[in-house]
Curated annotation (Swiss-Prot):
Alphabetical GO biological process terms: translation
Family: Belongs to the bacterial ribosomal protein bL17 family.
SUPFAM superfamilies according to UniProt: Prokaryotic ribosomal protein L17
PANTHER family from the UniProt entry: LARGE RIBOSOMAL SUBUNIT PROTEIN BL17M (PTHR14413:SF16), RIBOSOMAL PROTEIN L17 (PTHR14413)
Keyword Ribonucleoprotein: yes
UniProt name for this protein: Large ribosomal subunit protein bL17
Organism the protein comes from: Laribacter hongkongensis (strain HLHK9)
A GO term, aspect molecular function: structural constituent of ribosome
Keywords: Ribonucleoprotein, Ribosomal protein
Any one GO CC term of the record: cytosolic large ribosomal subunit
Pfam family, one: Ribosomal_L17
Family annotation (Gene3D superfamilies): Ribosomal protein L17
InterPro entries from the UniProt entry: Ribosomal_bL17, Ribosomal_bL17_CS, Ribosomal_bL17_sf
Entry-linked HAMAP family: Ribosomal_bL17 (MF_01368)
Length: 126
């Protein structure tokens, strides 16, 4: 029975799923906008939003937790120096998920995932 099982399996083993979600979160935090399938985007929200919440309180313990979850020093620096202060006044809801049509090859529903408060210069350039 499937009672109280929170996460989507996404047809992957647990280690593959964890690695994929970590890579998606790192890409999102690095580029601030990515395109992926809709189920992956919805699951990514559960991984990326707590990371941004960690970045709002710059302590050594939070930096170590963020590094444990991302395994990327550049992302941790950006998270605490840039994204944490940017979202300091927002209580959750850091991501925007927009439906982006269907993929050409297999007709999978696609989604555009972006950070809500992106700088205007970057948003206009892309």
């Amino acid at each position: 029975m499937r009672h109280r099982l929170a996460n989507r399996k996404l047809n992957r083993t647990s280690s593959h799923r964890l690695a994929m979600l970590r890579n998606l979160a790192n890409s999102l935090l690095r580029h601030e906008q990515i395109v992926t399938t809709l189920p992956k985007a919805k699951e990514l929200r559960r991984v990326a939003e707590p990371l941004i919440t960690l970045g709002k309180k710059p302590s050594l313990a939070n930096r170590r937790l963020a590094f444990d979850r991302t395994r990327d020093r550049e992302i941790v620096v950006k998270l605490f120096d840039e994204l944490g202060p940017r979202f300091a006044n927002r209580n959750g809801g850091y991501l925007r998920i927009l439906k982006y049509g269907f993929r050409q090859g297999d007709n999978a529903p696609m989604a555009l995932v972006e950070l809500v408060e992106r700088p205007e210069v970057e948003a206009a350039a892309e």
